[in-house]
């Protein structure tokens, strides 16, 4: 299977506090790099003779495949989460209020988690857990750690490549800018699909 980059779903010039240069660099270099890396790993695995390949080679490739796959998927959720998508309402708002007590409580926790990752790396994810039938805020230290069985509804990339060009070490300002640019309709669509499945 050959993976392809999904088109950028937002208009970078219309985002508040995030430059076009930052968004295009992040999209092309980091997301695009993950897609290219996954295609290369997939091709290598397809050619690997499983009967004779050293187990450490297979293990290394499978680990890198997981990292590249999650990087690709999380970047797709991240970029799809950006834009002018109206306000939070409907079933997603109701679920956030049910699972966090209020939208303000959810936002305070999600934002604080992002700011705590400043200068580090990882993701902050609003994830639907089908096991528990609820939304959870999740910290993922890298591309290989996400909630098993969970579906990311909203993704905040906290690797330095996502903000350093615009904000330097001021990760907290980047988190605030991200929160102003959430495309709630797309997040609601992901939530509805996760609940249906």
Curated annotation (Swiss-Prot):
Q: Which GO terms describe its biological process?
A: response to chromate
Which sites bind Fe cation? 26, 75, 157, 161
Q: Which family does it belong to?
A: Belongs to the iron/manganese superoxide dismutase family.
Domain of life of the organism encoding this protein = Bacteria
Pfam families annotated for this entry?
A: Sod_Fe_C
Question: What Gene Ontology molecular-function terms does this entry list?
Answer: metal ion binding; superoxide dismutase activity
The name on file for this protein is: Superoxide dismutase [Fe]
User: Which cofactors does this gene product need?
Assistant: Fe cation
Q: Which reaction does it catalyse?
A: 2 superoxide + 2 H(+) = H2O2 + O2
Q: How is the cofactor bound?
A: Binds 1 Fe cation per subunit.
Gene that encodes it:
chrC
Sorted UniProt keywords: Chromate resistance, Iron, Metal-binding, Oxidoreductase, Plasmid
Against SUPFAM superfamilies, the record matches this protein to: Fe,Mn superoxide dismutase (SOD), C-terminal domain, Fe,Mn superoxide dismutase (SOD), N-terminal domain
Keyword Metal-binding applies: yes
UniProt keyword Iron, yes or no: yes
Induction per UniProt is: By chromate; induction increases when cells are grown in the presence of high sulfate concentrations (3 mM NaSO4(2-)).
| Quaternary structure and partners | Homotetramer.
Entry's Gene3D superfamilies? Iron/manganese superoxide dismutase, C-terminal domain
Q: What else is known?
A: This protein is not essential for chromate resistance, however it may contribute to resistance under certain environmental conditions.
Q: Per its database record, what is this protein's job?
A: Destroys superoxide anion radicals which are normally produced within the cells and which are toxic to biological systems.
User: Which species does the entry assign this protein to?
Assistant: Cupriavidus metallidurans (strain ATCC 43123 / DSM 2839 / NBRC 102507 / CH34)
Which InterPro entries does the UniProt entry name for this protein? Fe/Mn_Superoxide_Dismutase, Mn/Fe_SOD, Mn/Fe_SOD_C, Mn/Fe_SOD_N_sf, SOD_C_sf
Reported EC number(s) for this entry are 1.15.1.1
């Amino acid at each position: 299977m050959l993976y392809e980059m999904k088109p950028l779903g937002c208009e970078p010039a219309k985002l508040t506090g995030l430059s076009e240069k930052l968004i295009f660099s992040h999209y092309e270099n980091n997301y695009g790099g993950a897609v290219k890396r996954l295609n290369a790993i997939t091709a290598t695995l397809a050619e690997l003779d499983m009967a004779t390949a050293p187990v450490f080679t297979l293990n290394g490739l499978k680990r890198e495949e997981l990292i590249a796959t999650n990087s690709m998927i999380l970047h797709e959720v991240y970029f799809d989460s950006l834009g002018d998508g109206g306000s939070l309402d409907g079933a997603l708002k109701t679920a956030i209020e049910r699972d966090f007590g209020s939208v303000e409580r959810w936002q305070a926790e999600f934002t604080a988690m992002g700011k705590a990752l400043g200068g580090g790396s990882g993701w902050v994810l609003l994830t639907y857990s089908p096991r528990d039938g609820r939304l959870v805020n999740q910290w993922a230290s890298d591309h290989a750690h996400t909630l098993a069985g969970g579906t990311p509804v909203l993704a905040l990339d906290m690797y330095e490549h996502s903000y350093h060009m615009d904000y330097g070490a001021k990760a907290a300002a980047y988190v605030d800018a991200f929160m102003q640019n959430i495309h709630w309709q797309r997040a609601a669509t992901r939530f509805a699909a996760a609940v249906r499945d």
